[in-house]
């Protein structure tokens, strides 16, 4: 009985950490789609903290989030964001989870990288205003 309670607790904690990482990644994607670095380092730090709490399964997420925190140029941040998004989408797939209500996984064909964004028109974080509508939603 105790083991079941602990398992349920840790599953809930992992779900909460995952939801927080997704929300922070969406915020980063939105900033990059608008060619801004506002709060990117702060959001990346929050993702790193949550990913670290999840341990080895989220290690790639943590590593990419750390890289984002060190980047000052938007091109470098976008490159690190690609790694973060691949790791986060891979983590969700491994957990058999969807991004959440009102969120979708999109893919940029130019860089062949995913991102999670709110439902609505494509807002490409990899090219921003240069190619804002470039991409498609994964089925």
Located regions from the model:
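Bacterial N-terminal signal peptides
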Residues: 1-9
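Intrinsically disordered, low-complexity terminal tails/loops enriched in metal-binding residues
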Residues: 8-139
